[in-house]
Structure formats: C-alpha cells, structure tokens
Amino acid sequence: MEGSKTSSSTMQVSFVCQRCSQPLKLDTSFKILDRVTIQELTAPLLATAQVKPGETQEEEANPGEEPFIETRQDGVSRRFIPPARMMSTESANSFTLIGEASDGGTMENLSRRLKVTGDLFDIMSGQTDVDHPLCEECTDTLLDQLDTQLNVTENECQNYKRCLEILEQMHEDDSEQLRMELRELALEEERLIQELEEVEKNRKIVAENLEKVQAEAERLDQEEAQYQREYSEFKRQQLELDDELKSVENQMRYAQMQLDKLKKTNVFNATFHIWHSGQFGTINNFRLGRLPSVPVEWNEINAAWGQTVLLLHALANKMGLKFQRYRLVPYGNHSYLESLTDKSKELPLYCSGGLRFFWDNKFDHAMVAFLDCVQQFKEEVEKGETRFCLPYRMDVEKGKIEDTGGSGGSYSIKTQFNSEEQWTKALKFMLTNLKWGLAWVSSQFYNK
C-alpha cells in the first residue's frame, strides 16, 4: 500500500492490487462500515456439511478432541481438521466503530479509517490463500480459476458417488469373491515382496561385484597408463639407440673406407716424400744442400738432414737391421749419430754456418758416418735380394758417391775442400739411393 499527501488538510490514500500491483480505487462502501458488515467480511469459512444429531452431541461433549476416522481396508488413518469458528462477535477480529468526527479531527478520523481498512484486508488475506485487495480484472481471473476447480471437484464427487452406488449394489457373493481376490492379491504381494527382497539381495551382490570390477578396471587403467608411459620411454630410447646405431654404422663405414684407403697407402711413401727441386734433392719439401746462387738457410738444411736420419732409422727398424759402428738418433733439425765404439762421441748432422763451419770437421765426419749406414743398409738388402742395386755407388772410405750411370764422376759428401755445387749433387745422389731403398722396403713389407 502507498500513500501520498497532496495538501495540509487532505490526504489521498491508494491501495495496490496484490497480483498486478496496479493502484486501486476503493468502493465508497468502505467509508461506511458497520459492525455487521465487518463481521461478514472477517468471518472464517464454515463447514457446510450437515452433522447428524448423535454426532453433534458427541462433538459438543468433546469439543477439544479432533475427529479420527480409520479405514479398514488400507489401514491408513485420516484426520479431519474443521475450520476455525467465530466464538464470539467480540473476538480479536472485531472492530470498534468510531462515530463521525468533527471537522477539526478529519486527519485523525482518516488515519483510523485507513488503519481499519488495512487491517480488514490483512484479515481477509489471512482467512484465504489469496492476498487482498485485488483489482476487478484479477478478481475475475481468480473467480474463473475457482470455477474451474469447482467443476473438477464436482466431477470427482460425481465419480465417487457412482463408485459408492456400485459398491452398494454389489451382492454378498461379489463381496466374497472380492475378498478372495484380495487374499490372492495379498499372497501375490507377499510373493512379490519376497522376490523383491531376493532381487534386492542380488542387487547388493551385483553392486558389490560392480564396485570390485570398477576398482579392478581403475587398477587396470592405471597399469595401462603406466605401461603406456614405459612404452613411450622405451620407444624414445629405441629411437635414440637407432640414431646412435646409424651414426655408429656411418662411422664404421667411414672408418672402413679410411682403412681401405690406408691399406692401399704406402706409409713410407706418404711420410717421406723424396723429390728434387732444380739442382737440389728434397725430402718433405726441405732442400738438402746449398749453392752460391741459392744460399739455402741452414735451418732448412738441418731439417732436411733430420728427415733423412728419420727415414733411414725407420727403414732399418722395419728390416730389423742393427747398424755397426754408429747409432742413428733422429732429433729433428738437431739429429746426430752416436759412435758405438766411443759413447761420448756424437757426430752432429746439423750446422749453423759461419767461420766455424770451415774449420769444424765434425759435420763432415757425421755425413760420412751416415753414408756408411746407407752402405750397410744396401748390403743388408743385397743379402736377401741379389739383384738389388742402387743407382749410385758409394765409397765410404773416401766419402764420395759416383755417378755410374751418367758422367762417371765422383762427388764428395764433405764440405771441406769441396765446392757447394759438388756437395749439393752428392747429397742429391744420396737421397736418390734412399728413395730406391724406400721403394724396395715398401714392396717387401707392404702387407706386413
């Protein structure tokens, strides 16, 4: 409900429909309410069913007890609660009417009237399931609904009456037959109850089995997931191992190719490359000798002598040859020969040049001793291969090499009292003899 004040002397009060919330204009009859009208509006609904005289006395004797009816067939107890009755006209729902107020009490009279009207609607709402007030349209709708419910109730009442008439018209035989059918139905009910109990037991057993099966299925799912993870891990390891295997196979093929290539490669020829560069004999691109027009550095000459000593030392070891009188000591560009008769005597196969070079004859003695070792190598080869012959004959006592296939001249391997041209040519012939010895050893010991 809502109210609004339009002036200081008048008040327009409007009520709202409790369904559609539309403002209402009350009928003028609400302004004049006597005691009888209020009692009719606020009186509760009374039971319309007539009560037998005997029952009336019983109810009057026990007004505080509630009627109790028990049906014999279904054993269901039903209780009827009558509606509340108006015990006195001076109950809590009564109103005290106020007479007409004077003009000075208009506002007070209007407030009281408003309170009475509001209380009246509250009482009406409490007596029924419908909230009041209602507008005309909502009232018509409510009446239509009540008419529908009334029709349904009347139809049900007619059906009950027909059933009651049929029951009253039934004979005793029909009743006995019905009782027999009832007993049969009761037996059938007991049988069905037993079957239901059996089914319930089976259901419990099946439920327990289902729970066990579900637990087993869950365990199997977990095992399957674990096996799947392990399978994935093994698959990953397999792929990695396959990659490693392919890599190793590729390495093996490459290593086999290199091995085949190395088997076909002569180690001595690959390690010691003897050739010539103009008038110089070279070993591994180091020139051995020097000319006035081409003053080769002594470091290069010493390195060439170191490679030459290493070559002869390797050939001797391959053949198992032990040199007499001297022992070769490969030591890079400071290689030397060690005298077997005098351990303290070392013959250096390197030189630094200068004035000392012309007066120091150890370098010459070392070259002659090396030529002696080459001669011993030649003699050792000739023991097993009589047809073996070096292109240049060597005279160890004189320290010379003869050009037997050419001019027939002899060239000293010493530097003292010798020209650089002849010394360089003698060294070139010596390298040529070593190349022939290298070729023979390679042919004899290639597969050994």
Curated annotation (Swiss-Prot):
The modification Phosphothreonine is found at residue 117. The modification N-acetylmethionine is found at residue 1. One of its GO terms (cellular component) is phagophore assembly site. Its main location: cytoplasm. The keyword Cell membrane does not apply. The modification Phosphoserine is found at residues 14, 29, 88, 91, 94. Residues 140-267 form a coiled coil. It is found in: Cytoplasm; Golgi apparatus, trans-Golgi network membrane; Endosome membrane; Endoplasmic reticulum membrane. Residues 243-448 are annotated as: Evolutionary conserved domain (ECD). One of its GO terms (biological process) is cell division. A motif (BH3) lies at residues 106-125. GO terms for molecular function: phosphatidylinositol 3-kinase binding; protein-macromolecule adaptor activity. Gene3D superfamilies: 6.10.250.3110, Autophagy protein 6/Beclin 1. It is a peripheral membrane protein. Expanded poly-Gln tracts inhibit ATXN3-BECN1 interaction, decrease BECN1 levels and impair starvation-induced autophagy. Plays a central role in autophagy. Acts as a core subunit of the PI3K complex that mediates formation of phosphatidylinositol 3-phosphate; different complex forms are believed to play a role in multiple membrane trafficking pathways: PI3KC3-C1 is involved in initiation of autophagosomes and PI3KC3-C2 in maturation of autophagosomes and endocytosis. Involved in regulation of degradative endocytic trafficking and required for the abscission step in cytokinesis, probably in the context of PI3KC3-C2. Essential for the formation of PI3KC3-C2 but not PI3KC3-C1 PI3K complex forms. PANTHER family: BECLIN 1 (PTHR12768), BECLIN-1 (PTHR12768:SF6). The C-terminal evolutionary conserved domain (ECD) contains poly-Gln-binding domains such as the ATXN3 poly-Gln motif, consistent with structural docking models revealing two highly scored poly-Gln-binding pockets in the ECD. As some binding is observed with BECN1 lacking the ECD, other domains of BECN1 may also interact with ATXN3. A homodimeric form is proposed to exist; this metastable form readily transits to ATG14- or UVRAG-containing complexes with BECN1:UVRAG being more stable than BECN1:ATG14. Component of the PI3K (PI3KC3/PI3K-III/class III phosphatidylinositol 3-kinase) complex the core of which is composed of the catalytic subunit PIK3C3, the regulatory subunit PIK3R4 and BECN1 associating with additional regulatory/auxiliary subunits to form alternative complex forms. This is Beclin-1. It comes from Sus scrofa (Pig). The gene is BECN1.
